């Protein structure tokens, strides 16, 4: 189930302030955030937001198709190295 329309989308207050400040200054520098649960809004289009994946910040360039999704969807937290070929070989 999605979030109630009455409540509106969740977005961290600090992230909103940073995006609005950059929009008013016409600044396009990278914004660092730890808020993976924040919803992408139309005002973020064209910005690069570095989303924390648990280890590093992954830069995500926001496009129109991403609006409505969460920031965490675009910064994978797990790495897949493949299954071992055989017991003797290793990786």
UniProtKB/Swiss-Prot annotation:
Coiled coil (UniProt feature): none
Superkingdom of the source species: Bacteria
Cysteines joined through disulfide linkages: none
Function: Protein S19 forms a complex with S13 that binds strongly to the 16S ribosomal RNA.
NCBIfam families: rpsS_bact
Any GO CC annotation of this UniProt entry: cytoplasm
Protein name in UniProt: Small ribosomal subunit protein uS19
GO MF assignments: rRNA binding; structural constituent of ribosome
Xref: PROSITE patterns: RIBOSOMAL_S19 (PS00323)
Record flagged with keyword RNA-binding: yes
Protein family: Belongs to the universal ribosomal protein uS19 family.
Keywords from the UniProt entry: Ribonucleoprotein, Ribosomal protein, RNA-binding, rRNA-binding
Record GO biological process: ribosomal small subunit assembly; translation
InterPro entries: Ribosomal_uS19 (IPR002222), Ribosomal_uS19_bac-type (IPR005732), Ribosomal_uS19_CS (IPR020934), Ribosomal_uS19_SF (IPR023575)
């Amino acid at each position: 189930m999605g979030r109630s329309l009455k409540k509106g989308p969740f977005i961290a207050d600090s992230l909103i302030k940073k995006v609005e400040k950059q929009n008013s200054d016409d600044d396009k520098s990278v914004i660092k955030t730890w808020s993976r649960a924040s919803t992408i809004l139309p005002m973020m289009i064209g910005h690069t937001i570095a989303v924390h994946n648990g280890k590093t910040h992954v830069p995500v360039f926001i496009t129109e198709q991403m609006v409505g999704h969460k920031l965490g969807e675009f910064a994978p937290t797990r790495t897949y190295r493949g299954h071992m070929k055989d017991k003797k070989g290793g990786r």
